[in-house]
C-alpha cells in the first residue's frame, strides 16, 4: 500500500510543498525568513482574532476597549502586546526577506517577486489601519496625515479623501471601516502567500551562488524543517522578550493619550517600520511629488528585475555591487532615523541627501556596477 501522504489529494499538496519538496543543499539561514513570515502571519491572525472579540470600533469606546483588554481580559495584555510587537517582528522579517531577495538576485523569479511586492503593500496597508484602531493621539493624527496625502491627487483628491473618511474628517465611519479592512486583509494576505509559494514551487528555490541547483537537491523534510525550527525558536524568544520585558519599546507614548481632534501632537510620526518611507515623503517640498516618491520608494522593488545588468545572478562574487548594497542598507537606516526626527536643520538636508542616494544606488549605481563587473571579468560582449 502506497503512503497516504503521497496519494491523498489534499495531503499530497502539503507533501509536495513542505515534505518531499526538492530544495537546494546550500541555502543559508537567510532563507529561514520565509517560514518565519508565515509564523508571524499565523501569530497575528490568532492574536488579532482574540482582540477582535473584545474590541469595539466606535470612537467613544475604542480607547476604553483596549484598556479593558489589557486590564480585565484574561491574558489580554499578553495578546495585545504580542499583536503589537508581532507586527514589528513581521516587518523585521519582511525587510530581511526582501534584502535577501535583492542580494541573491531572487527577483529574477518574476511572478514570485511581483506577488511579494503586492504582499508588501498589503501588509503595510494592514499595519497602518491596525495602528489607527486603539484611537490614541498618534492613531488619530497618523490616520489624518496619511489619508490626507491622497488629496494631492489632481482633480479627484479632495473628494477621494472625504470618501475614504466617510465624512469631513477622520471620525466614527473611518474607524469602523478601518477595523473592517484590518480584519479582512490578513486573510487576503494568507491567500496571496499561497499564490506566492505556488509560483516559487514552479521554479524551485534560489541559492546563495545564484547558480542552477537541480543537480544537487535534498528533501525539505527533515533538513529544512529542523533548520526552520531553530529560526522559529529564536523568533519566539525575541518576540516574547520584547513582549514581556519591553512591551512599549517600539510604540509611541502619545498613543496612551485618547484621540483629541483639537490637540495636535508636536511630532506626528508613524511606527518605526514606516519611518524610512516617511522620511522620503518629507524630503520633497511639493505635496504630490512627496506622495509619488513615497509610493515609488516601495514600488521600485517591482523594477528590480529590469535593473539587473550583470551576467551573474547573485552578489556573492560581485564585490563592487556588494559595497553598494551595504551602502543602501546603511542609507535605509539613516532614513529610518531621520523619519523619527523633527523637521528642522540639519535633519531636513540629511533626509534629502539620503533620499537622493536611495534612488541613485538602486536606479543608477547598481546597474552600472553590474556592467563594470562584467567588463572586469571580460564577460561583456
Curated annotation (Swiss-Prot):
The chain crosses the membrane at residues 33-53, 77-98, 113-133, 178-198, 226-246, 288-308, 320-340, 347-367. It comes from the Eukaryota. Heme b b562 binds at residues 83, 182. Its cofactor is heme b. The keyword Membrane applies. A ubiquinone binds at residue 201. Heme b b566 binds at residues 97, 196. Heme 1 (or BL or b562) is low-potential and absorbs at about 562 nm, and heme 2 (or BH or b566) is high-potential and absorbs at about 566 nm. This is Cytochrome b. It comes from Apomys insignis (Mindanao montane forest mouse).
